[in-house]
């Protein structure tokens, strides 16, 4: 597993007809490296918006030193909430739990990197 820093993003959806927010969230990553220095969660949002009939928005972003590890741990821990790929169906309490766990794992990743 690579040790790249980056961002864990939480992208949500809003129905354009009803104006209601859905409970679907994409939990994905953007790696920081010199090959895609201009790529961040906002850029990923635009990429995902193409072809999606609902309005996407960034619910939250967590920066971490070990982005792939943090994402893998989140996806494994919350697998029962997964719908398809990186998409999860989360009520507000579940979303808060996943975001909190992402923050905790990101802090632990910083400690690991600082010890190296």
Annotate each PLM feature:
Residues 1-116:
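Non-catalytic accessory segments flanking enzymatic or RNA/DNA-binding domains
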């Amino acid at each position: 597993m690579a040790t790249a820093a980056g961002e864990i993003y939480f992208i949500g959806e809003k129905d354009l007809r009803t104006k209601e927010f859905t409970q679907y969230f994409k939990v994905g990553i953007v790696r920081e490296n010199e090959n895609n220095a201009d790529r961040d969660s906002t850029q990923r949002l635009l990429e995902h918006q193409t072809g999606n009939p609902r309005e996407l928005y960034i619910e939250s972003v967590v920066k971490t030193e070990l982005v792939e590890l943090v994402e893998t741990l989140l996806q494994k821990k919350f697998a029962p909430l997964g719908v398809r790929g990186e998409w999860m169906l989360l009520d507000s309490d579940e979303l808060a739990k996943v975001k909190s766990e992402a923050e905790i794992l990101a802090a632990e990743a910083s400690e690991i990197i600082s010890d190296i």
